[in-house]
Amino acid sequence: MGERVLAVIPARFGSTRLPGKPLARIAGKPMVQHVYERVRQVQGVDRVCVATDDDRIARVVEAFGGEVVKTSSEHRCGTDRVAEVARGSDATLVLNVQGDMPFVEPATVEAVLALLLADPSLPMATAKVPIFDRIAWENPHVVKVVTDRRGQALYFSRSPIPFWRAGEPSGPWGFKHLGIYGFRREFLLEFAALPPTDLERAESLEQLRALEHGYRIGVAEVQEGVGIEIDTPEDLERAEEVLRADGPQ
């Protein structure tokens, strides 16, 4: 029997810099619809749903024909929300695609899924893209990841890693972590039950919880990235400009 793949888009109404973010309109559609339609294009996914505790988001998703699962309002993070959906599902693999990525490339999500399909012992996977801009590499809002020779995560940080002691590198400054995750269902439920760890709290990066507890995270290197991630009104304006010009980049 093959794997059953569930893709979940966690969406919450509250946002410090952009309240109601999932419902912000880009080119006439709510952002959550852009994400949903792109995830529907991912090869190998059997089911796509939006997980939310907000009735306004739920109504919008139902209006465009998407599946919505109402979840608790008590979750600490998006992964906990995804885990609640997984708990009531018969899926064997679960993808978590953030709801602020209206330009996410289906191929990027497929690369994460491919790691889990290729290695049945791998509990968790994610993705990275090269950083060629020093300013982005130094930006604490851009999460970096370093991996071993097998492509598995050694560490994630908001700090600029690795440190180039001898000067500028000949290639990329580092790799940006993309907020797309794949889990084996049983590990996702275990992960959500683990207590937060010191490094997770220090960096405010929940994936460090897995590393600190000794679990492997496979990291797919991709070139497409996820395009513009929407966190501010300025990001929304840029997204509109991209769609007006020549479609998603």
Feature map (PLM): residue ranges:
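Residues that recognize and position ribonucleotide moieties
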Residues: 16, 24, 102, 181, ...
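Conserved alpha/beta core of the MobA/IspD/sugar-nucleotide pyrophosphorylase nucleotidyltransferase superfamily
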Residues: 170-249
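Hydrophobic/aromatic residues located in beta-strands of well-ordered beta-sheets
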Residues: 7, 48-50, 94, 125, ...
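N-terminal glycine-rich phosphate-binding loop and ensuing alpha1 helix
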Residues: 3-51
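Short phosphate-binding loop-to-helix
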Residues: 49, 55-114
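Short, high-confidence coil segments that cap the C-terminus of an alpha-helix
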Residues: 45, 91, 119-122, 215
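Conserved core of the sugar-phosphate nucleotidyltransferase
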Residues: 104-197
